[in-house]
Amino acid sequence: MSSSTEHPTPAAVRFRVAAYDDPQSVRFVDALQQFYRERYGGADRTPVRPDEFAPPYGLFLLGDLPDEPGTAVCCGGWRRHDTASIASADAGILRAGDAEVKRMWVDPAHRRRGLARAVLAELEATAQRAGCLRIVLETGDQQPEATALYVAAGYQRIPSFGVYRAEAGSDCFARDLAEGSFPGAPVRRASSSGG
């Protein structure tokens, strides 16, 4: 048995665009919300709408392994902020044109294989191609593994924003998406057949 079969590299993941309300997306979002309930005692209260993750306003991706096409093992999305979507309390923190990462998740059976970094790299690359200049995200102090990923990927802490801006334990990060400013994991993209 080859080690690449047992532990696929991030380069082996194939990303495809999916609707936020696609059944496979919903399965992952539900699993993520359950994770939040276990770690924080409740689901994420950040309001999201499926249309925020549809081009050109954003993007939602599912990642498949080559030996399991059509069966997602990870996901993530980003939504673009404009002046109308930035709450007055977040002015000066968020900028028009920022891409906000939301709903990043790797199936527990496929963790510790670099897939979270691959999802993050693909979200960065797609946001940059869509003209976003910066990527922002929020995590919490009960997710040290997420914080470690973002710091290792070159993200810098910024003041808290969003519904948790005034709560202790809200950790927010940003990274510029200037041309060539981040190393993306090599990824093969599956052809999009809608969805």
Protein language model regions, located:
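Acetyl-CoA-dependent GNAT
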Residues: 10-102, 107-108, 120-122, 126, ...
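Conserved catalytic-core motifs of GNAT/GCN5-like acyltransferases
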Residues: 20, 136-141, 147, 151-172
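Charged, amphipathic alpha-helical coiled-coil/dimerization segments
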Residues: 113, 125, 134-136, 151
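Accessory recognition modules or surfaces
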Residues: 117, 169-178
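Conserved GNAT acetyl-CoA-binding A-motif
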Residues: 120, 127-139
